[in-house]
Amino acid sequence: HTPEECKELVRYAHRILADNPFDLRRMAVLVYANNLLDNESEVLFWQARIHHLVDAIISTGDGCTPETAWYIIEPVHAYDLLNTLGVIAESYDFCPPCYDYIQVYDLIGNARGFYFNVSRILEEYQRKFVDE
C-alpha cells in the first residue's frame, strides 16, 4: 500500500472504532497501516490494545467446557481469538442455552474444540429484536 492508502486505512479504521471500540480486526488494520507508515508509537499502542482485549477474553475461562467457556460480546471475537491461538476453525455448533462450540485443528492436524459463552450477545438480540 502507498502512504496515502495507509493514511486512508487509518482514517476508516478510526471511524469504525469510534462506533465499535472492540473491533479487533480494525485494530489489526491500524497496526498494519501504521507499521507501513513507520509510526511505531501507534503500532505499539494498537498491539497493546489487541493483546489487552484478547487477554480479557482469555481471563474469563479456559474454553474447554460450557462451564469454563470464554465470554465474548461479538461473534467474530471467537474467530479472532482462535486465530491468535494459531488454530483453524473447522465446524461450529450452538449448544443451548448460550454456548457456541467451535471445532478446531492446529497446524499439525490435531483436533479439539472450544466453548464460547454468547449469553450477552443473545440478551442484546432479545432486547433489540424479539417482540414480547
PLM region spans:
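Conserved small-residue packing positions in alpha-helical repeats and bundles
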Residues: 1, 14, 30-35
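TPR/TPR-like (Sel1-like) alpha-helical repeat modules
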Residues: 34-58, 86
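Glycine-rich, often proline-containing surface loops adjacent to acidic residues and nearby aromatics
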Residues: 22-30
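Boundary/linker segments of alpha-helical solenoid repeat arrays
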Residues: 24-25, 52-66
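Helix-turn-helix repeat elements of alpha-solenoid scaffolds
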Residues: 1-10
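Canonical positions in the second alpha-helix
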Residues: 15-16, 50
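Terminal, low-structured helical/coil segments at or just beyond the last alpha-helical repeat
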Residues: 68-132
